[in-house]
Every structure is written in C-alpha cells, then in structure tokens.
Amino acid sequence: MKRLLLALALLVPLAASADEGMWMIHALNQALEKKMQERGLQLSAGEIYNADAPGATVSDAVVSLGFYCTASVISDEGLLITNHHCAYSDLFDLSTPEKNYLEDGYWAFFRQDEIPLQGKEVYFLKRVLDVTDEVAAVADSLTARGERFGSRKLTSILERRYAARTGLEASLNSMWAGEKYYLALYSTYKDIRLVGAPPVSIAAFGGDEDNWEWPQHKGDFALYRIYDHGEPLHSPWHLRISRAGYREGDYAMVVGYPGRTDRYSSSYKVDYLTRVERPVTNRLRGNQMEIVRKWMDADPAVRAKYSDWFFSLSNVQEMQEGEVQCVKRFGVVDEKRAQEKDLPQDILQGLADEYAAIEDIEREKAYYRETIVRGMRITPTMLRMSNAKTPEARDEIYRRDIGALDARVEKDLIAYSLEEYFGHMPADVVGPRQDSLRKAFSGDWKAMAEHLWDNPLVLMDFITEVKITAFNEREKHTGDLTDLQHRYTRALYHDREAKGIVQYPDANSTMRLTYGVVSSLEPWDAVYTSWYSSPRGLREKYNPAQHDFALPADFVAALDRYDGPVNFLTDNDITGGNSGSPVLNARGEVIGLAFDGNKESLASDVSFTPDYNKCVCVDIRYVLWILEDYVGLERIVKELK
C-alpha cells in the first residue's frame, strides 16, 4: 500500500495539489511545520512528536502491529482500532466450522468475551536517536581489532547496548544505504485481545474486484485491546474521534508505519523489474488465483481453508500488475534516467551491465520461486518434513498440516506448477529424480500431480531436489549488484543534497508522517470521481449471488438508517504497512482509517505521481454507525465518548 528543511520534495516536482513525502516523525522541523500549517494544520510539530513529553502527543497514541500494520489507541482503556484486513489472519485462525468469525464477524459484548491472541505484539515509539557517529565508531573499533563484521553484527551490538541502557526494545535502521543510522526505542505489549470485527462481506465489500479501485465501499476496521498484567492498559493519552466530518480540500494527515518503498532505485532496476521479473510472477500468480478461486466459488469448505492464502496472493499480484502498468503509463524509467544523469558514470554503467547479465538467471529463478516454492500451498509442509530429525516427527508434521489443505485444490496447483516449472527450467537446475518423473509421465501433469499427492515422501524429495547450486554458480559471474545499488543510493543522496533538494528516506517500517488534503480523483482525461462514496454505492453493487458483493440481509435493511460517507480519498503518501493508520484532521482527531491505494498510484513504491496518488480511507462515522446502530455495541460506543 504510501519534507524536512525545505518545502519541495525530491523525486518529482510537486503539483500544488499533492504533498509527497513519508517524513520521519522525529525530524519534524519549523519549515515542515510551516508547510503543514499552510495546508491547514492547527497543531505544532511538538504536539505531533515530542520524546521529552511522553504521553502527550499524537505519535504516542499510534502503534505498530508487529511491523506489518498500524493501529491507534482510541480510549483510555487501551482500545485499538485498525483495519479488518490487518486482523484477517487472526479471524481466520480463530474460526471453526461452527464459529466462522471471518464470515459472521465477532463482537465482544462483554469484557470477558475479548479473545486473547497468541504471538501478537504492539509497539509504542518512545524516542528516535541519531546514532550515525556511534555506528561508525563501533565499525572502526571492530576493524582495529581485526574482526570481520557486517550490518547484522553492527545492528546487534547497537540494539543490545541500547536495550540494556533503557529497558526498551531497540531497533537500528539504516537510511539512504548507510548514510544515516537511527535507533528507535519502543515499549512493547504482548497481551492483545480481539474486541470486534464485522463480517468480511461488510469489511471487504467488493473483494478482489474492487481492490485498488475507486470508488470503494468497505467497512475495513477491527478492534483490539491492549492488556497489561491482566488488566486493560490505562492510556490517558489517546486519539479523539471526530464526528464533524470534512470537506474536499480539508487538511488530512496520516501517521503510521509504512513498510517498504524503493524510491532511490535506479532506472535500470525499475526497467528490469517491470520488463523481466514482474511479467513472470504476475502471470503465474494470476493463474494460481484462478485455480483457487474456482474451487472457493464451488465449495464453502475450500473458501474457509484458502481465503487467507488467497487474500495475500491476490493483494500482491494485483499490486505488482498495477505497478507495471503505472511505470509504463507515467514514464517512470525515463523520469529516473533524467534524475540520475549527473551521477558517476562508473556506477551507472556497472548497473547497466549487471542487470543485463542477470536477466536470464533471474527469469528462471522467478519461475522456480513461483512454482515450486510459492505456487503450491503444501510446499512449507514438505520443507518442514525434510528438516524433521526423525521419521516420527516428519509424519506428525504431515498429519498436523494436511487437514488445512484440500486435495482437489492442491493437485490442480501442483499440476500447474509442474507444467510451468518443466517448461522453463534449464537442464542443470532440474534434479535427476525430477527428470525421471517428468519422463515417466510424458507431460501428463495431472497424472504426475496425482502421483506426487498420493506419495508425500516422493513429493517432499521432488520439492527439495532443485539444484540451487546451479543458480549460484552462474550468479558468481555477475558481480556485486547489491554494492552497486548501495553506491547508487548514496550518490543520489549526495547529488540531491548538493542541489538543495529536501529528502526523506525510503520507508522501512519506522514511524512516518504524511500530510495533504481530502481530494477527488481524475484518473483519465474528462473522467472525474468524487472524494467520497456513499451507501448508495453499496446498494448499487449489492449482489447476493456473488460472494464479493453479498451482504447480510439485516445490514442491507439497516443501510436506510445511514446517509453519511462510507469511504473517502486523500492525497496522503502511503504504502503497505500504513494499513490501519489513523487519518487525522487539522486538530489531530480521527476522521478515518487508511486501508488502500488507488490503481493509478501503484508505481508509488518507486515513484510518487502527483495528482494520481491517493489514499483510500474508511470514514470513522461509518465505523461508529456500524458499532452503534447495526451491531448495538453500546459499551464500546460509550467508551469512545
């Protein structure tokens, strides 16, 4: 999913209607504060982040959910709100045939009904430190002692040092390929409980078809609670919820934990990804989705087993397919070539040579990854079996895992993977037993899949026999691409610094702020779409015969009682990891939750496109209406007041 000293951003010239930048929360200064206030912000930078005033700023109420999603504290009893799709795996894991929390939703009407979750953690940011000089000193000390070290050792030393000093969780982050190092300190909580989530038909209305589209009509939210020593966390500082709404052009700000961007990537990398690797992965994943979708539509039992896997697969496939289209549409490769024209020629030539050298190898590796490794859901089970220390342990792994799979689906996935794998793998990668099976079945992939499924030990050997050494042997001659990419990033950073261009680092799951306004979208010439969607769209799309557009009958009837916005658009700069982030108004009050981007923004991991990059949000008033009117969860509604 998407300014420090001056008012201009770095990757492309900014139009007046969009403010690019995932700004480091601890680096908000007067220039950026002024720019945000010109947009409408009514807070000071110190009211957004201030490590010396704990529990008194916006950032103190925004948490990371395991560094894969964002959530925010919205009551003084540790109540968290995030996206439903961030809770999807929890709901999937908790569901049983008798209690399907994904399909039916879950609501804890009493405190004792809040469900403890295994392995879930939330992280509160307490402070960010610039440790660039300290990292350099540690590196110099290790070098002087003649010790070999890499980034992992440096990270371990710094994190252990600061964890011991502070008693907090420490996380070292490299920015601009090592130009700067920042260390974030977190307090963590591990007793997290599920409070509520709507049925997936409400939360993800429109499903796969509406993903990355606009307009959308999703009630994409879920509620958790943080417990401390068995009691709800006392959190006097929390975000306030606004029922006042907003208008087009109103200030909007997102604070969260964006996962990864690659805006310092070279033109050579973007060209390689969109021309070589992505077409392979997108085609294979798209066909795998169709296989699974066919069985999910035919059998609810398959949907129950595969919906989580399908959701993850479809989200990535659609995002990367859209990325290829947007890179071409917006001329991102040419844009990057213009930006890098003043960089050292030896770096540019090195990148050109290296990417040309790895094209065939990486295309083959993509086929291997998307068939044998990722193309069959049973592969992780087979890999765990191969690592078991005893036959008994191996058999137990198989018995434990096989119930979560459907033989019909797996055999179809295996057959498709076999056809693509043998159709594109060079002979020196295919193992001898693999080749014997291929010859024995003479291209009858369905029969071969039946044989492998019926003989799990043969399937285990087949999956683990790929000769990775053959890939590695050819790659030895391609040089150190990683080093060249790091040199490129640092050179681009210094080039922009010399030109006075304000820079923010690529997203890396650290807390960031992005600001902008509520805004409409014009995706194509003469095509205008509103900045909000309404219940009318739910009724227009509603189709009880189509799973992605079905809704509970009582919800359809209740819609007559709601006439506010459902979803809305801002031009905030977000990406994956921002899911669940609070969308805040000029006073720092919650007006919605970020949950998606639009398809025109899908090149944003490598390049921000003004006027087209949008953040799709669920309106907090729609959330409150569901809780208060449709569900009747009065204890939570009162807690929010």
Residue ranges and their predicted role:
Residues 4-13:
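Sec-dependent N-terminal signal peptides
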Residues 15-641:
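Terminal presequence/propeptide segments associated with secretion/organelle targeting
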